[in-house]
Amino acid sequence: MEEIKLYGVKIDNITRDDAVRCALRATGEACVVFTPNALMLERARKNKELADLLNRASLSLPDGAGVLWAAEKMGTPLLERVAGIDFGAALLERAERLGLRVFLLGGGEGVAERAAEGLRKKHPSLCICGTSWGYFNQSGEENLGVLSHIRSCRPDILFVCMGFPLQERWVMENLQHLTAIRTIACLGGSLDVWAGDIRRAPAWMSRVGLEWLWRMLCQPKRLAQLPKIVSFLWHVPQKEEFRAQNPL
């Protein structure tokens, strides 16, 4: 599979449909899916530990117009944007057809349960085998209890929705306890959308790469992240500079 690197973080050059097929391929070990966006990559640019964490993914999907723009600027264009929530939705459609079991982990109190209710209405044949909230102590007995609950539900697919880098760290630190799961995907705030707590951007805004603007308009506290997005875009090397730094 072709990949590029942004600030030392690998990004797979893949379509959403191919990503779903790849994520569900039976290989004997879990396919771990991360979805780096501009804010995540900006943090990784300043913190090698975060870059190394992102690089442990089996599949790394370009989430956001900023990532596509940066890849284009470097002369390494990507096939398409694969937003985490769109990937998750496509994965759920495939899970419903194949009879796969899904576990939802993350969100505040009741969020995963409401997300499950909403998804069952949309996908009547989908098997959501279990849910758990994301605000638990990620060490000690409470963490072991969550892991035990997940394993007892026997999911084929696990969605972990706690935000970056908490969700990615938790997955990698506990991967040895989740070996029976086929696909583990970190999907940020997807549960809040599926639960109906947060509205997603209109389709036309997503198509033209303005979903980030919608989020900031709906959640003004996100405006504080705007300088980080600008910094990410500013530091992306031009094509000539990138090639000089990465000779064949």
Give, region by region, the residue ranges found by the protein language model.
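Conserved beta-alpha
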Residues: 72-149, 153-154
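Short, flexible loop segments at boundaries between secondary-structure elements
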Residues: 133-138, 181-218
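N-terminal nucleotide/polyanion-binding subdomain common to many enzyme families
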Residues: 1-86
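Proline-aspartate-enriched helix->loop->beta-strand connector
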Residues: 150-164
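Short glycine-rich anion-binding loops that position phosphate/pyrophosphate groups of nucleotides
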Residues: 37-41, 162-167, 190-191
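Short Gly/Thr/Asp-enriched flexible loops that form oxyanion-binding sites at enzyme active sites
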Residues: 116, 168-177
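A transmembrane-helix-recognition feature enriched in membrane-embedded lipid enzymes
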Residues: 66-72, 200-248
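A short helix->loop->beta-strand "cap" motif at the edges of active sites that frequently abuts
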Residues: 30, 100, 179-182
